[in-house]
A protein has these predicted regions:
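Residue-level signal for secondary-structure boundary elements
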Residues: 19-23, 37-40, 96-100, 127, ...
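Acidic, proline/glycine-rich low-complexity IDRs
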Residues: 113-169
Length: 169
């Protein structure tokens, strides 16, 4: 049976999706494991001091918040769907992600269905997952390999990390 440290490292590796070096993944995994095993001690540390409010609002969400903070550069985060789309385009500068389709969809769900098909068709196949809680109005997710999505969701469920396969959930 794997321990939480191994599960966290696997999760970080899959979320990083080849965008981080192994030494960075190891360091991030250690930080997340520390927050996971003892959230209060993590919050009391210099690294976690600015997140003290989270102990009152969502103490179980501390490890998720730490993952978000540590991997911030690979997240897409904003409060407007067209800005989210621009961030997705930046993730794939060489891929054919067209400009935001203003007026093409009657609602947000239709946009995310269209985007999912587009990412699925971008080799080797990607998926935008919802991850964590922005504790505000922001959409917050990251693009992962579609082949890894089920394992990511399993790891998140096992570790009590808030995530879903769709921005609509």
């Amino acid at each position: 049976m794997e321990n939480n440290e191994d599960l966290i490292k696997e999760l970080i590796t899959l979320l990083a999706n080849d965008r981080w070096h192994e030494e960075d993944i190891n360091e991030i995994s250690e930080t997340v494991t520390s927050a996971y095993n003892d959230p209060e001690a993590y919050i009391d540390s210099d690294e976690g001091a600015e997140m003290a409010w989270l102990l009152e609002v969502d103490p179980e969400g501390i490890p998720t918040w730490v993952i978000f903070n540590e991997l911030f550069d690979v997240f897409v985060v904003c409060d407007k769907i067209d800005e989210l789309h621009e961030q997705i385009q930046e993730v794939f500068p060489e891929a054919p992600v067209p400009d935001f389709p203003y007026g093409q969809f009657p609602g947000t769900p239709d946009y995310f269905i269209w985007l999912d098909k587009l990412l699925k068709g971008t080799p080797p196949g990607y998926q935008l997952i919802s991850f964590g809680d922005s504790y505000g109005d922001n959409l917050q997710g990251l693009i992962v390999s579609r082949a890894d999505t089920e394992r990511i969701m399993h790891l998140c469920k096992t570790l009590n990390i808030k995530a879903s396969k769709s921005m609509l959930d």
